[in-house]
Amino acid sequence: MKRREFIKSAALGSMGGLLISQTFGAQAGGNMLTPREVEGPFYPITPQKDKDADLTQIEGKVGRAKGTIIDIFGQVFDQDGNAIEDVTIDLWQANSYGKYHHPHDNSEAPIDPHFQGWAILQSGKQGRFKFKTVMPGAYPLNSPQQRTPHIHIKISKYGYESLLTQLYFPDQPLNDKDGLFKRKSVQEQKMMTAKKTSKSNEYRYDIFLQKAF
Ligand SMILES: [Fe+2]
């Protein structure tokens, strides 16, 4: 190969690499996309009527979920930072004892009859969403796979790559020991971790989706 051709092909090669890293890597349009995570075994399979944004109360029941009540809000954006409305946000989590309302969760942690455990929300104006829940418990110590507190989320809207992820919380001592969390890069961990606001028990969590076409 002549020197000039070699330089040209090397330049094209590195450009190709750049394009690939923009498409499949973390960086797109200046914003990092929310990283993906596995679904886990406990996506709800028992039908339930109440899937609203307050997971601390079940419609028609008197009483409130046990644990620390927390508020989470945020916005959904595309990779260019445009807010996306009408995005479906389907989320589920363990109760404050670390137990899922799922027939396959056979840990000895108690069920909380007042905890809703599952919500399906839509992002509204400017892609905003919010929900009230309890701080999920770590899976019990006797569970074979101990997990740090997390919330599972499935996000979908026509025209965007659907996203399956998990939300984490800052300053959780188990984060460093969590098998799934540890596998992520520092930057990915940052994207997946809600940020504490100045209000007590309130967190901000923004979601970045990839346009499908
Ligand atoms: Fe989980």
Task: Explain the meaning of each model-derived region.
Residues 28-192, 196-213:
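Beta-strand-dominated extracellular/periplasmic modules and repeats
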Residues 1-18:
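N-terminal secretory signal peptides and thylakoid transit peptides that target proteins
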Residues 20-23:
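N-terminal signal peptide c-region/cleavage motif recognized by signal peptidases
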